[in-house]
Every structure is written in structure tokens, then in C-alpha cells.
């Protein structure tokens, strides 16, 4: 279904997939290894003997893109060690890049939200955030795009798990498709911009120059709801 729906665009526009939880489900919603993802997406090799192409990086212009895999809870029973292997690889990969900008894409989000009308849980940092946010600080990552929660949130810059202009910019990319959770997430103290409620689809654009990255968020009708600019001399 995905290939049919996106086939024309993928054939004409470069496509960089980010593996998520649905890549580790079969048609009966049973957890498995990401077999279809690995079959259909010829992403760059990462040099791993155990997790080849589960995560990867590539360069486009003066940007080094790092695509991480947040699905270690799903893969652990079949093939343990995905999180720890990525932590070691990320240090080496990011440190080796000489590109001006470093951008991370990862499916599961770095923050944990309280939820309306669900069992209470504490607002804070997610397991993914605990694993990677200190590394993003250490390695000078400029921008982090996340997903999974089907909502658009701009968190601004975060460092040491707190708002800090010296940290990476964190963007939860939003909604695409017909799965929406109106009124589910209770706003996090680190949210700076939230999409108009109840949410509809949205899309993002990104423009990179020698000195700036500009990210904009739009609703399907073209209304701009957010704009962020990163600068670097």
C-alpha cells in the first residue's frame, strides 16, 4: 500500500526513510524484525554485522543527516543490542563528519507526555530522550526531528534536559494521514508551539544556506503556523 501510494513521488524525489514501530509489526500486529523495511529501502550501509541498514547517515550539501532507529524495545527479543550499538556508532559517525550542520531524524519522541483520560504518567523525558539527548548535546547536533505521537510540537532548544539556547532544536513533526488523537496529549512544559487544535495534517519545509537553516510548518491549506531559524557563522 505504501509503495503504491508513494511510488510516483519516490521515483522522482530522493526519499530517506526513518524506521518506526510499524516497521516491526506483521499484518497480524505481531512484533517482528523490520523485514519489509529492509527489503524495500536501499539505505546506506552502516558497517554493522548485526544491524546493517537499521540506522544510517548520509550527506546532502553541507548537512550531515543521521537517521536513528528507536525500535530497540521491539527488536530486543529477536536481536538484542540495537540501542547500545547505535550509541557507539553515533559518537563515531557524528565526530567524523566535517559538514557544517548535523541533523538527526528518529521516530519515537524524546519527551514523555501526560495523557488525558488515560492512566496517569509523569511528564518528563522518554526512554529515547534519556538514551540520546545527552549525546546530541555532546556531539553538537543542530536539529532533531521526531515523530510517533501524531501531533506537531516545537520545543525550541534543549540542553541537559532543560530549555537552553545552546542546545539542539527539537521538532515533533506532526500529523500525516487519518490517524489523529484529538485532545490526547497534555501540553509539556518544554512545548513552545503547538498546532491549532483539533489537529489536522501538516507538512514541513526546510531551507539550508551557508549560514542558516529555516524550518517552516504549514497546514494543508498553506497557512504557516510556525517558523524557526538556526544561524551559524
Question: What are the language-model segments listed below?
Answer:
Residues 112, 116-123, 170, 220-233:
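A short, hydrophobic/aromatic-rich structural module that often spans a beta strand
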Residues 146, 154, 227-229:
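Residue-level detector of high-confidence beta-strand sites
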Residues 20, 93-94, 105-108, 135-149:
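Conserved beta-strand->loop/alpha-helix structural units within folded catalytic cores of enzymes
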Residues 97-115:
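Short acidic, glycine-rich surface-loop motifs adjacent to enzyme active sites
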Residues 1-98, 118-132, 143, 154-198, ...:
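Extended active-site neighborhood of metal-dependent phosphoesterases/phosphodiesterases
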Residues 70, 150, 218:
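Acidic carboxylate-rich catalytic motifs and surrounding loops in phosphoryl-/glycosyl-chemistry enzymes
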Residues 190-233:
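A short C-terminal boundary segment appended to hydrolase-like catalytic domains
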Amino acid at each position: 500500500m505504501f509503495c503504491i501510494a508513494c511510488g510516483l513521488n519516490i521515483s522522482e524525489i530522493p526519499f530517506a526513510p526513518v524506521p518506526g514501530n510499524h516497521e516491526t509489526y506483521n499484518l497480524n500486529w505481531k512484533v517482528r524484525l523490520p523485514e519489509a523495511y529492509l527489503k524495500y529501502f536501499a539505505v546506506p550501509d552502516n558497517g554493522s554485522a548485526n544491524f546493517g541498514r537499521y540506522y544510517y547517515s548520509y550527506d546532502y550539501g553541507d548537512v550531515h543527516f543521521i537517521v536513528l532507529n528507536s525500535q530497540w524495545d521491539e527488536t530486543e527479543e529477536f536481536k538484542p543490542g540495537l540501542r547500545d550499538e547505535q550509541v557507539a556508532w553515533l559518537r563515531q559517525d557524528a565526530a567524523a563528519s566535517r559538514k557544517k550542520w548535523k541533523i538527526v531524524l528518529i521516530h519515537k519522541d524524546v519527551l514523555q507526555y501526560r495523557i488525558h483520560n488515560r492512566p496517569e504518567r509523569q511528564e518528563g523525558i522518554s526512554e529515547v530522550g534519556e538514551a540520546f539527548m545527552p549525546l546530541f548535546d555532546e556531539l553538537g547536533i543542530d536539529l532533531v526531528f521526531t515523530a510517533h505521537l501524531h501531533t506537531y510540537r516545537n520545543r525550541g532548544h534543549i540542553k541537559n534536559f532543560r530549555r537552553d539556547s545552546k542546545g539542539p532544536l527539537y521538532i515533533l513533526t506532526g500529523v500525516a494521514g487519518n490517524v489523529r488523537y484529538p485532545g490526547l496529549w497534555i501540553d509539556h512544559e518544554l512545548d513552545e508551539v503547538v498546532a491549532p487544535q483539533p489537529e489536522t495534517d501538516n507538512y514541513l519545509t526546510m531551507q539550508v544556506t551557508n549560514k542558516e537553516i529555516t524550518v517552516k510548518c504549514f497546514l494543508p491549506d498553506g497557512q504557516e503556523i510556525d517558523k524557526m531559524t538556526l544561524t551559524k557563522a
